[in-house]
Design a protein with these regions (language model features):
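Cross-family detector of peptidyl-prolyl cis-trans isomerase
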Residues: 1-117
Length: 117
């Protein structure tokens, strides 16, 4: 498979296509995720993982409670599916970075598994 690039610059690839309910804006979704820094096609340091904590993450899709790349990238997934997201800085943490773990203007790579939609 190959990555699809959206008009915003988000890249995504479904590594596993789910068969359950579809993630839609306005509904809470439950995901497991792992995030890495990503630079010129090379996966860098892991900065966060719900799997490491053993605790899924729940958020309202499209509600602006997460970075824009997640609101856009999780939409349309189906329960049971796994998607890889490559998120440019403008859809991530931008020039401010985050918490000393994510430098300013960082591109991010996430593996997201949709557990509930």
């Amino acid at each position: 498979m190959a990555f699809t690039t959206t008009a915003s610059g988000l890249q995504f690839e479904d590594t596993t296509v789910g068969t359950g309910a579809e993630a839609q804006p306005g509904r809470n979704v439950t995901v497991h995720y792992t995030g890495w820094l990503y630079d010129n096609g090379v996966q860098g340091a892991k900065f966060d993982s719900s799997k490491d904590r053993g605790e899924p993450f729940i958020f309202p899709l499209g509600g602006g409670m997460v970075i824009r790349g997640w609101d856009e990238g999780v939409q349309g997934m189906r329960e049971g599916g796994t998607r890889t997201l490559i998120i440019p800085p403008g859809l991530g943490y931008g020039a401010r970075g985050a918490g000393g773990l994510i430098p300013p203007n960082a591109t991010l790579k996430f593996e997201v598994e949709l557990l509930g939609a």
